Amino acid sequence: MFNKKIMLIFNILIGLITIYVIICLVIFLSQRKLLYHPNENNYLDENKLTHKIEKVFVKSDNKLIGWYHFKDRKYKTLLFFHGNAGNLQNRIYKLNEIAELELNYLIIAYRGFSGNEGKPTEEGLYNDSCLLYTSPSPRDRSL
């Protein structure tokens, strides 16, 4: 009787541990899909840019597409990676608000988003941000 209870508890623990390991494995194997969502064109047509931008192309391992808004040289430039879902057009409402500040901005889409080549990776994001951070502004040289 005592051995049956111990075996039952042991079997339940083994089952719970197995389920936990399977869940962890599934999450680990699908982490890229969980972090980087596909493009969706769910932006509203009434979202129009209220300011001028320049379309820029950044050469890293892949060619990246971005938008640059230049207001004045005396202002700092905000480097903005728009996020892990959607595309540049999905961020127009944010860009209109940023344009009202005393800032220039450069918004870049992740690899694999907004027509960019490649696949998004953590290492690629670090490399792209370091390249853009250490580069002169698009006004100073062609990216």
Per-region residue spans from a language model:
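An N-terminal hydrophobic leader/cap segment in hydrolases
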Residues: 17-57
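Conserved small/polar residues in nucleotide/adenosyl-binding loops
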Residues: 133-140
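Glycine-centered tight beta-turn/hairpin loop motif at sheet-sheet or coil-to-beta transitions
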Residues: 59-63
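Membrane-embedded segments
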Residues: 65-132
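N-terminal Sec-pathway targeting helices
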Residues: 2-18
